[in-house]
């Protein structure tokens, strides 16, 4: 203003520059910085990092690369963290992953963990990269936050996956194993549990028991009457098509495959992504629950993303908008 009778002391100034500067500071304050923590070095991990970084940058946020424990001090400038896989005893990066979890818990910072997806995850074909990878805050499987409660049907429809009706017949009980040193096996002696649960199944039903071994698992149940699955180390769909009455499992994603293919599941483990549509007591083996799976499937589709969705920023925005709502 040039001043005047009401504001004679005011000098002329450029409000455009002032408001532009204020706008830039406001924009700067809303930019989020994500610590990209390099915890795994497989081909799928490299693609996960590459595409997630593209997505963060695509929406105008920043990244800081963190390759080891010594560089973790850089996390102090970050609003959130991203890593591939959770800590487990068999990983050479186990200590790094454990320290990342401790840091996130102490600082109360979001820690996004990418892991194997649940539908169309292609985990039995490592060369096929057209796959879905799960993304959760604070962990993996059902111990992570996905901000997916009461999700709409859009992502499930996008998968174009036909969920099979519940099966009402079947000859075999399939017990699905997993890697005893994996992170989702650390809260239980899974080897002892397999023996115990197979013995209980033997007492409750005359149906023969098949045991599906994890490809990386060497030790097998030593008690109970069972036969090895004829499809060990092959796509689990072949097992599920082998006249299966019910699947019994802990936290393996094979339980999700069973549910999607219409085979009832019994799991006592709330780590399992199948838990909400499964039975939890082995005494249900002769009459396993077959609940409505519709909303469960919709919610499941919001737990996982394809590589192009990571690269576009769609996956990152889903979490960003829940962690820091736009109105804030």
Residue ranges of model-derived segments:
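Short, well-ordered secondary-structure micro-motifs within conserved domains or adaptor modules
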Residues: 68-102, 246-250
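Short loop/turn segments at strand-loop or loop-helix junctions that form parts
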Residues: 2-4, 35-40, 82-86, 114-118, ...
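Conserved catalytic-core segment of nucleotide-activated headgroup transferases in glycan assembly
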Residues: 168-220
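N-terminal pre-catalytic "stem/leader" segment of glycosyltransferase-like enzymes
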Residues: 1-86, 181-182, 323-328
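Leloir-type glycosyltransferase catalytic cores
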Residues: 34, 123-170, 276-328
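Well-ordered, non-membrane alpha-helical segments in soluble/globular domains
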Residues: 12-19, 45-54, 92-99, 189-200
